[in-house]
A protein has these predicted regions:
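Ligand-binding clefts of soluble mixed alpha/beta catalytic domains
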Residues: 1-301
Length: 301
């Protein structure tokens, strides 16, 4: 039944919403020849949807093993506060001699959100469904009914004193249409803001440096976060707005321990292959390679 639904989603290019609760495959079902021969088509079919149609994962409760593997293939994961996500449930963990844990202890959102697994954290399943609907709306083109905030407020959005920090999210709210901002991975890579917005009814992806974190410097999590979001926008032909305010990539021994070279370089690799327009706005500063990475690899139009 699942395989047929995935096949139809691919053939008809239908968005997929996956409610992922569950403990994985049941021994009586997964011990048949196909699975023991490592020929379970569901995972390949699910992963093949990536970049082909929007795929949203929703978790409200426990999600382990095979369910979690499919969840990880989703473009965006929405989880409730009581969710627990893990590649193995309590029985598997105990069977492997790794200890005894309650399901809620395996992968709570208290660390699955800051580590980037969960994209959007919500209160309950009802809110999760509402957010999923809002997310999918950005892939359906412009809307006619929109309202812009008072654009005169932008004149005072950035302090004249360059030593004063400001709230980049407030700036984003002024640029975007009212009630059109949907931030992705808010708790992960806090030095970079990634969000879907609308401007005059048209959908855009947005990346922005956060001056409240390292003065806007791009660290490893921020680079990884931006690159993945740029890929998502490019896959579905959503143009990008980049708000640049960075002194560059983070440097120093502590930064190098995080494999920053690999992570931030992904922004150049992704930027070089972008097929959608990228509109760059330098809010205060844009120095070095970090600034170039915010503009798809360079300032050349």
């Amino acid at each position: 039944k699942t395989d047929r639904m995935l096949t139809l989603a691919e053939q008809w290019r239908l968005p997929l919403v996956f409610y992922a609760e569950g403990g994985g495959g049941r021994p009586g079902d997964t011990d048949r020849l196909g699975m023991t021969g490592l020929d379970g088509p569901s995972f390949v079919q699910f992963a093949r949807l990536s970049g082909h149609v929007p795929v949203v994962g929703v978790v409200s409760g426990y999600c382990f093993a095979g369910n979690a593997a499919m969840l990880g293939c989703c473009d965006v994961i929405i989880a409730t506060e009581n969710a627990s996500i893990g590649m193995g449930g309590p029985a598997m963990i105990e069977g492997g001699g790794l200890g005894v844990y309650h399901p809620a202890e395996v992968g709570p959102v208290s660390f699955q959100s800051p580590n980037g697994v969960v994209d959007i954290l919500v209160k309950d399943e009802e809110e999760a469904t509402t957010v999923a609907q809002k997310y999918l709306s950005y892939f359906q083109g412009p809307i006619a009914d929109w309202k812009a905030p008072d654009q005169r407020l932008l004149r005072r959005a950035i302090p004249e004193n360059r030593l004063r920090v400001y709230d980049i999210r407030s700036v984003i709210e002024l640029i975007a249409d009212e009630d059109s901002v949907l931030e992705i991975r808010r708790d992960f890579g806090v030095g970079m803001i990634t969000a879907f917005i609308r401007i005059e009814g048209k959908p855009f992806g947005l990346i922005a440096n956060n001056p409240k974190h390292l003065g806007g410097a791009i660290d490893a999590p921020a680079g990884d976060k931006a690159a993945r979001f740029l890929q998502l926008c490019d896959a579905f032909d959503i143009p990008i707005v980049s708000l640049c305010d960075t002194p560059g990539f983070m440097v120093g021994p502590e930064a190098e321990k995080t494999a920053i070279v690999r992570h931030v370089a992904r922004m150049f690799v992704t930027g070089a292959s972008l097929t959608v327009p990228l509109f760059g706005i330098v809010l205060r500063k844009g120095y070095g390679l970090g600034a170039q990475s915010m503009l798809g690899g360079g300032f050349h139009a």
